[in-house]
Amino acid sequence: MERMELIAPCHFGLEAVLKREIQDLGYEISNVEDGRVSFYGNAEAICRANIFLRTAERVLLKVGSFKAVTFEELFEHTKKIPWEKYIPKDGKFWVTKAASVKSKLFSPSDIQSIMKKAMVNRMREHYHVDWFEESGASYLVRVFLMKDIVTVGIDTSGVSLHKRGYRQLSSKAPITETLAAALIMLTPWRKDRILVDPFCGSGTFPIEAAMIAANIAPGMNRSFTAEEWSNLIPKKAWYDAIDEANSLINDDIEVDIQGYDIDGDVVRAARENAKEAGVDHLIHFQERAVKDLRHPKKYGFIITNPPYGERLEEKENLPGLYREFGDSFRNLDSWSAYMITSYEDTEKYFGRKADKNRKIYNGMLKTYFYQFLGPKPPKQKK
């Protein structure tokens, strides 16, 4: 397949992290917008992006972009896209998702049905058939309208990329794997420094940190929709990407990554998830309350997603919980703490104003990534 444009959606506020990841894979960025990064690549890039990107939600193959303010325009422009170039005669195809922002066309169901009709019309004319069996591979179309500009892509990932395949057991409000990885990558943490999550839940932060430290690609243990696209991507491209990922793993390393939680059942679930991810030997999990958080090591990192009170009765406990967290952190005077939370009184009860603060959307929930910075460790004498 010739050079194409790919679109990688991500969490709002984390585009710079994903952009850096894509550049590290060797691909040229074509555009950065709120919640997505576009780049150029080939068939191999589809495989490598799905397997290696830690912070993308999925990878879309861009097939068209045009302006439409009426359903007639939407139909005609959709019909002009050379769908036969991407979808074989036996392919299963539908518009699985439509999103519209500040556009005249705003009904997702209408957008989906009109675009599907236009696709069928185009492909009927090309394949000279009246109906399609749709017995082959799946081609899921996603469309996004922003200020009347329609962007059309075919989803190469299928299930969202935050589904790494290791989370068998979950705590009640887990952070997604893609968001956890992005937040870790926003910090200056490196594998030679201790990392502790005192509210580890099902273990997402420690597991993602261990996978980063051991250079384990996040998409190695799952499948992707585009694996079945034999008309576009040779199987060898997938095998080569997996071989590359395997060759880069270095899990024979010394790291100090720890996860604590007050709930023993949750800690056991975290251990099982770490085992599924192949990093259980790199993480120490322990049942421990945040008021008992202490450590003899210096210059450590806390990266965590503390409770922020989804339910009213939980909200009443938050001042005490954040106060305990702040008291424990003050005793770790050389450490840095990074926490994502939507709790508006975080700084008040934590007892310290954040050195940096970043707004991040976790789905539709507005959260803040508070950064409480400790001193830098002294440079080692050579």
Predicted regions and their residues:
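Non-catalytic nucleic-acid substrate-recognition regions in nucleic-acid-modifying enzymes
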Residues: 2-139
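Residue-level signal for inorganic ion chemistry
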Residues: 22, 95, 143, 305, ...
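Short, charged/polar, Gly/Pro-enriched secondary-structure boundary elements
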Residues: 44-51, 159-162, 378-380
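Class I S-adenosyl-L-methionine
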Residues: 96-98, 144-186
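A short, flexible beta-alpha/helix-coil linker loop
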Residues: 100-103, 160, 307-311
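Conserved S-adenosyl-L-methionine
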Residues: 175-295, 310-311, 317
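C-terminal catalytic and target-recognition region of SAM-dependent MTase-like enzymes
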Residues: 289-382
